[in-house]
Amino acid sequence: MTEVELWSRETRAQRACAALVKNGFDAVYVKTAEEAADLVMQFVKPGMKLGFGGSMTIKTLGIQDKATQAGAQVLDHNKPGLGAEEKLDILRSQLTCDVFICSANAVTMKGEMLNIDGNGNRVAALTFGPKKNVVV
């Protein structure tokens, strides 16, 4: 990526972040994946119950593993070997967790987040339930 392309992306990201703040979100721009993971982990404390929306971004950042290592209780509805009823119980329990962590499908330059969901747990958690939501 050229220096101009990098500057353009960073400028757009900062403008979108400012628009999110204008719309009432607590939004922070970070430059690197490592900074993003570190910022998310500031919300994770030992013993907390954490829910996760299905997110390749969160998976790539290694947040679930880091949260487990930090002593948090990870409510993982994608854990191998779960039966349908067990998975549904975990999805429901994510609605009352301490922190729900997910990513947005898109963020507009007007400061709007777009979220589409297969199970409904991410959209439900973003609108009602968890004590705090962290969206990457």
Regions found by a protein language model. Name each.
Residues 1-136:
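The feature marks the mature, well-folded catalytic cores of soluble enzymes
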